[in-house]
C-alpha cells in the first residue's frame, strides 16, 4: 500500500471512531441517532381503524402513555384503507417526525411506506401486525399463530375431534389474518371438520351476514371460530337469529363486548390480547431508541384463553 493510501485509510478509521451519536438500532442500519429526551420527541401514529374497540383501546393506550411522557403525538385513522394509510405516513415523513408507529391495514401494501420512512431515516415501529418488507425498529404484537392454535385446541377439547366448524377470517392481506388462520387451520385440518372459511374483514355487520349465509346450508355446524371478537359477536347474532342451540362461538381479542357475551352465554370463549399495553410498549420502544438503549426486533404481548370460568380476570 502506498504512503498516501495508508494515511487516508488511517484518517477514515479515526474519523469513524470519533463519530458521536447512538449508533445503529435494529431496523435502522446506517443512521446515526441524536440523543433526545421523551419530551422532545415528535411521533406519528397510523392506526388501521378506530371503528373497532380493539384499535380504540390501542389508541387510548398510546395517547395515555405519550401524555404521561409529555411526547408530541400526531395520530391518523386510516379507516381500513391502505391508500389512505400510505398518504398519512407520507405526511408524517414530510413533517419529519422522530418515529412512525404503524398498525398496518395491509402487511404487503405498507412496505412501500416503510421503505419511504427508511429512506428518510425515520424509525418505524409496527403494532399488532407485521409487514412483508422494509426495515423496522421493532414489531410489538401478540403471537397470532399461537392465538389461532389456542382457539382450535380449546374447540377440540370441548367438542372432540371431527366437530363441524366454520371459520370467519379477517382483512385479506393483514398479517393477523394470515397468522391466526395458519395457527387455527394447522389444528383444524387434522382434528376438526372445517366446513367453510370465509372473510368478514374483522367487521361485526359483515360477519353477521356471512355467518347467516354459511349457516343456511349447514345447520349442523357445531362451532364458529372468528379471527376477532367483532366477527364472533356478529356470528353469535346469526346463530341466535337462526334459532340454533349449543353452537360454540370462539373469538380473539378479549374486548369488553365479548366479555359480556361470554357472561350471557352468547359467546363461549375468546383469546384475550392487550392492545393498550401494546401501544404503551411501542411508545417506550421509541423512547428507548432515542436514549441509545437496545430495542428488541420483536416484542410479544401475552395472550390468554378467556371463558366463563375466568372472564372477570382479564380486562383491557
Language model regions located:
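A residue-level marker of the well-folded mature domains of exported/periplasmic proteins
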Residues: 16-316
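Sec-dependent N-terminal signal peptides of Gram-positive bacterial secreted proteins and lipoproteins
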Residues: 1-22
